[in-house]
Regions:
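Conserved helix-turn-beta segment of the N-terminal RecA-like "Helicase ATP-binding" lobe
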Residues: 1-12, 106
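Conserved helix/coil segment N-terminal to the catalytic DExD/H
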Residues: 15-23, 30-47
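SF2 helicase motor core recognition
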Residues: 35-36, 91-93, 269-273, 296, ...
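Conserved P-loop NTPase motor "coupling/switch" region that bridges the ATPase
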Residues: 49-53, 67-154, 353-356
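Substrate-gripping "pore-loop 1 plus following alpha2 helix"
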Residues: 58-73, 338-339
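Conserved helicase/translocase motor-coupling segment
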Residues: 154-275
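Conserved helicase ATPase core of P-loop NTP-dependent helicases/translocases
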Residues: 280-317
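A conserved SF2-helicase RecA2
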Residues: 336-345, 349-440
Length: 447
């Protein structure tokens, strides 16, 4: 652990709390504040004059223990309370409510939590929060005028080279995806049959409730799409290594153009590890099973030229590590949240990068890939209003065959229909459930 001067006191999990300085700084994880109320009480009794909350978006759930502990600490300080984050919004205005409470602006500027939420958010047909799009420009104006000091990445890191995005459609063996599809339909069918056997006439409202409360059932279908893309991804990686690996003067391998490959689901990472040929050398992994203290050392193998490809989990390696020796990124899978994708991209596109970064997303037809991109486009549009100039358009292509004409992405009519119909995960589930119910009953189609 690093050494600190006596006036800086870090509090670490699993260790005895050291004496507080008469005057100085206490550094503590918000997870400890949430899990140890007596520690929070002791810090409040210490009488801090100001409080800084790093990564404040981690406490975006108003009633959560972390958010409640942060607010209690914020209310106790006599001076400034400053929340800091690069991602205040992930999808809707409700997520910033607690951050505004920490900064002291929620009441004076917006009249409190209830008034803020009523003004800027509404509930969708599944009961989830979504923005009132007409009010987003007003929210951005209020935040800029009264609440936040905000700088975009390109304004701060002007020396960074461009980050370009493109897609690549790959052929897949549909067997595994079809099996997951059938399993999903069978699971939903059991619910439908049970309802019908109990004499329940299934309404559209019943379907909405089911969709809202069973979001997890879509995960195996997403993972199956990722697994189905693995053979194509491995061929790409093999070709990449063959084209970019040279032999140095001492006979060692030199990886001239390292590659970062991202996945999201654990089953996809496990299937990837199992499918990689035994003779494929020069590769590394960072996933949920990699201890946090070993993640950057694993990344350093790529940074130091020891490996030519690293396979990473978005949630395990999408933040806090540096992979700037690479400027090429492939996503076998992505995420529902634009910020999680751009954070993963920025493991290569950050201070120290000197090359143009090329981000390639692998897509498979007749899977959920198109639906995911529709949802991401919708979220990106809202986030662009709230945070102009931020990196929210993770599906917008900036490298395309028509680049010379200034046309980076061609959206088909089908893409636009998907964007209209699918704004959240429950929308996808509702469509599937409705299809199954229609096959078993005479439920009228929704308008």
């Amino acid at each position: 652990a690093p050494e600190f001067p006596p006036y800086i006191v870090p509090i670490r999990a699993g260790r005895k709390v050291p004496p507080f300085p008469e005057a100085g700084v206490i550094v503590v994880a918000d997870s400890l504040l949430a899990s140890r109320p007596e520690l929070l009480d002791d810090i409040i009794a210490w009488g801090p004059q100001c409080a800084l909350f790093d990564e404040a978006h981690r406490a975006s759930t108003w009633a959560g223990k972390r958010a409640t502990a942060d607010r209690n600490l914020s209310l106790s300080v006599s001076g400034l309370s400053v929340p800091m984050t690069g991602t205040p919004f992930k999808a809707n205005p409700v997520e910033v409510t607690n951050i505004l409470a920490l900064s002291g602006h929620l009441g004076p500027v917006f009249g409190g939590a209830s008034e803020f939420i009523e003004r800027y958010a509404t509930k969708d047909r599944f009961g989830g929060w979504m923005p009132k799009r007409k009010m987003l420009p007003d929210l951005e104006r209020q935040l800029t005028a009264h609440c936040w000091v905000r700088r975009n990445k390109q304004d701060v890191l002007k020396q960074l080279p461009p980050k370009l995005r493109t897609t690549r459609v790959v052929d897949i063996d549909r067997k595994g995806f079809a099996q997951a599809h059938e399993a999903l339909y069978e699971k939903i069918g059991l619910w439908v049959d049970e309802m019908l056997e109990n004499g329940v006439e299934i309404t559209q409202e019943d379907i909405k409730v089911y969709a809202k409360t069973h979001i997890e059932i879509i995960t195996p279908l997403r993972a199956a799409a990722g697994v189905a893309k693995i053979p194509a991804a491995i061929e790409i990686v093999k070709d990449w290594l063959q084209a970019t690996t040279e032999t140095g003067p001492d006979g060692s391998k030199v990886y001239t153009r390292p590659l970062v490959v991202w996945v999201h689901h654990s089953p996809v990472m496990e299937a990837l590890k199992a499918a990689i040929p035994e003779d494929m050398a020069g590769i590394g992994f960072i996933d949920g099973g990699t201890p946090e203290h070993k993640r950057q050392p694993e990344a350093d193998k790529l940074q130091n030229g020891e490996i030519g490809v690293i396979f990473c989990s978005i949630m395990a390696a999408g933040f806090g590590i540096t992979l700037t020796r690479s400027s090429d990124v492939i996503f076998i899978e992505t995420d529902w949240t634009p910020a999680n994708i751009s954070q993963a991209e920025d493991r290569v596109h950050r201070i120290g990068q000197t090359e143009t970064c090329m981000i390639t997303t692998l897509l498979a037809v007749d899977t959920l890939d198109a639906h995911m991109r529709a949802i991401l486009r919708n979220k990106g549009k809202d986030l662009n209003v709230l945070m102009p100039g931020a990196d929210n358009n993770v599906t917008v292509m900036t490298a395309h065959l028509n680049e010379a004409a200034g046309q980076y992405e061609i959206l088909t009519q089908e893409d636009r229909e998907l964007e209209k119909d699918f704004k959240s995960v429950p929308d996808i589930i509702e469509r599937i459930v409705t299809e199954i119910v229609l096959k078993r009953t005479s439920l009228p189609r929704a308008a």
